[in-house]
Amino acid sequence: MAQNEGIPNGTLSAMVIDEDKCHADSTCSMICTQLNFCVTVFTSPIKALDFLQNQAEGVHLVLADVQMEEMNGFEFLKVARELHKSIQVIMMSTETTIYTMKRCVQLGAQILVKKPLDVVTIQNLWQHLDIKVLKMEKIKDMLQGVGDKSTCANEMNSFPENQKDGTKRKYYLMWTPHLQKKFLHALEILGEGQISLMIMDVDNIDRKQISTHLQKHRLQLKKKLSKASFTKGSNEDTSNPSAKNHLTCRTMTLQPHPYTNQPAETTMQIHSEDVEHDDIYDAMRRALQDGTAFDESKYSSDPFSNEDEDVVGDGYADKANAIDSSGDHYQVAVVLTTPHNVDYTQEIMNKVTTSDDVQVTRGGKATVSRLVDYSDSDSD
């Protein structure tokens, strides 16, 4: 039955003590059928106590009536608990008052049930028992040799074969903090060359285990030292401010190809160069190729900066080339305006970049070659 699951069957015994023989027999049959217990019936409480005194260890459950003429049920419960402390007693009574229930529990009974007992009460009776105690009794019987022979044979066959041959099992030593402390103490006294077992004073430990642990200890020390040195080096790098001065930032500016076709109307940009570190002639050539102009305010100290502008081409202004005779470098300021004729401007740029007509002599005026546009008419 589903309600009887978990009940230890087979080897458990019970006693029923009731002066009403008819009720005692019916209770015995129901316990045997529902719980599968071995039941013994007594109509005399004195005889039941004599049986418990001789075989108290073999009885696991007792059902006793409270209203008995030969001996009161409370007195029977008290004596039975003195004979066998772990015995479990369930009291039966026709009157289940609060006083009766409290008295039974105080004397050590599990529960008080109402007479007469029916099948439902018997089925739920095992729920009030201490199943752990009953299972422990069954385990004790099994250890004494009571049990299924086939089960014992299977358990014997499950052992490893090396135990049948009589070989010893291999044990592993666990280095607890206490053993580690003794190991380090011996290491400080004798050094890494040798560690005496007498100093450690530990049983069940040999030299092989100590040497193996010593190798592991050395590896751990190497790891700690390498980690400490790496951490120290990284801290020095971060704390040294001079290391930051070696960091340089270089920026590369991409400019369009000088021969690519630019739109007719372009935005003019001011192209400033460092006169002290760059050649002015190269700067002029690069400015003409890029279609940009130099800022004249950078060369305000030039004595030739006030020269008149020369008219070239179609009448557009071309700033005269100014030469700084006082310094080692000369300055050239060129202003190019983009006319409607883009091809004409490109032709001027090509002639200037490839021409060698512009000759500059240091300490004197530069010879300026002017570009003149000749008309196709013969009159000019």
Curated annotation (Swiss-Prot):
DNA-binding is among the record's keywords: yes
Localisation: Nucleus
PTM (free text): Two-component system major event consists of a His-to-Asp phosphorelay between a sensor histidine kinase (HK) and a response regulator (RR). In plants, the His-to-Asp phosphorelay involves an additional intermediate named Histidine-containing phosphotransfer protein (HPt). This multistep phosphorelay consists of a His-Asp-His-Asp sequential transfer of a phosphate group between first a His and an Asp of the HK protein, followed by the transfer to a conserved His of the HPt protein and finally the transfer to an Asp in the receiver domain of the RR protein.
DNA-binding region: 169-223
Region span, Disordered: 225-245
Pfam families listed in its UniProt record: Response_reg
Annotated positions of the 4-aspartylphosphate modification: 65
One cellular component term from this protein's GO annotations in UniProt: nucleus
Principal subcellular localisation of the protein: nucleus
Coiled coil regions in record: none
GO biological process: cytokinin-activated signaling pathway; phosphorelay signal transduction system
Start-end of Polar residues biased regions: 228-245
Record keywords: Activator, Cytokinin signaling pathway, DNA-binding, Nucleus, Phosphoprotein, Transcription, Transcription regulation, Two-component regulatory system
Similarity-based family: Belongs to the ARR family. Type-B subfamily.
Full protein name: Two-component response regulator ORR28
Organism: Oryza sativa subsp. indica (Rice)
